[in-house]
Amino acid sequence: MARVLVSSPSSFFGSPLIKPSSSLRHSGVGGGGTAQFLPYRSNNNKLFTTSTTVRFSLNEIPPFHGLDSSVDIGAIFTRAESLLYTIADAAVVGADSVVTTDSSAVQKSGGWFGFISDAMELVLKILKDGLSAVHVPYAYGFAIILLTIIVKAATYPLTKQQVESTLAMQNLQPKIKAIQQRYAGNQERIQLETSRLYKQAGVNPLAGCLPTLATIPVWIGLYQALSNVANEGLFTEGFFWIPSLGGPTSIAARQSGSGISWLFPFVDGHPPLGWYDTVAYLVLPVLLIASQYVSMEIMKPPQTDDPAQKNTLLVFKFLPLMIGYFALSVPSGLSIYWLTNNVLSTAQQVYLRKLGGAKPNMDENASKIISAGRAKRSIAQPDDAGERFRQLKEQEKRSKKNKAVAKDTVELVEESQSESEEGSDDEEEEAREGALASSTTSKPLPEVGQRRSKRSKRKRTV
């Protein structure tokens, strides 16, 4: 007879519930089972261990004499197995949480940003209670979305400041490239001129980093608040098509390296949770990956020949896949937060960058610097390849025209010089003949060779 053994792993702290990563396996005929030693803490803070073995054997079930043969026993046990996994999904317990035997109080993870996470958790519960009071369905799911919107609105001024600083740096890039080309090889001079340019334009290169650093504790606190709520087992309700906000896995399972055990290995050709629940849980990671790619396509910077930028864009292409993989190993409540935050971030960036919501944070005296840099960039790097081809053709035509004009000018100068030289040769010949005719002495005249003109010398040298 077949039996079903359910045993809790050693990382589970004193809870009688089953973790999502608990093993559910079928073995051969016979009884017996496996026991795991489970640590827990008593009231005096001493660590004890206890063993737990859950055995379900068909040998212990009496025969069914009065049942009809049409009853599907396999379907009954399949439903029981699904129920066990549903209970396991609800029992999301953090790896660093300790459950005492008396009060069952959960120790929350906080760290440096514990006060922020406590405040976020309090606001989340208030939002959930308020939505439940007005009979809004899926109260916890909508509470997560509302809390994300509130935090995003609170950090909007910092985001705007960061975008304005980034736009100012982008406007100065043509001038910075001109400095790098002018002082190529002299790194010290490049740094000096660049810092002088920043000072003249009133731009601080570090101004774009400070708002981002300021928002990091807020988002870490929100993440920890959602993790604490999941660890407390409060994400038991579903959200539209999602069976449970605490499923399909837990924070503890992710930290132990078994965050995707709900997907693999397959049991009898189907995933452990069944096809319906598995597909329902996979919708959020797929939506998260799709939203990441849409955001990257909308905010994609203009293409350049910079190899560093090409390598960065290549890395960013695989980033959504990594985020989707992380979404497989956390509760669905955190995936809803990630998806909402990504959609809101994309909307903010489109408004600030594309629709003119943010203006470059620069002094008015920097307008001439920016216009000069843009003019150089437009001349040196035309945006369209066809425009560059037309410029080259026009330049070639102008060069040919200049050569033709220069050639005509040279020919005219040569003709005028040849005419003046021929006139001077005729006058010299007449003077020589007159001198010979007027000579009355018998003294022989010296032989005078034929005199070559300057034009003949010029032709010979050419």
Curated annotation (Swiss-Prot):
GO terms for biological process: protein heterotrimerization; protein import into chloroplast thylakoid membrane; protein localization to chloroplast; thylakoid membrane organization. Belongs to the OXA1/ALB3/YidC (TC 2.A.9.2) family. The C-terminus (339-462) is required for interaction with cpSRP. The gene is ALB3. It comes from Arabidopsis thaliana. This is Inner membrane protein ALBINO3, chloroplastic. It is a multi-pass membrane protein. Required for the insertion of some light harvesting chlorophyll-binding proteins (LHCP) into the chloroplast thylakoid membrane. Required for the insertion of LHCB1, LHCB4.1 and LHCB5 proteins into thylakoid membrane, while it is not required for insertion of proteins PsbX, PsbW and PsbY. Mainly expressed in organs that contain green tissues such as leaves, flower buds and stems. Keywords: Chloroplast, Membrane, Plastid, Thylakoid, Transit peptide, Transmembrane, Transmembrane helix. The lineage of its organism: Eukaryota, Viridiplantae, Streptophyta, Embryophyta, Tracheophyta.
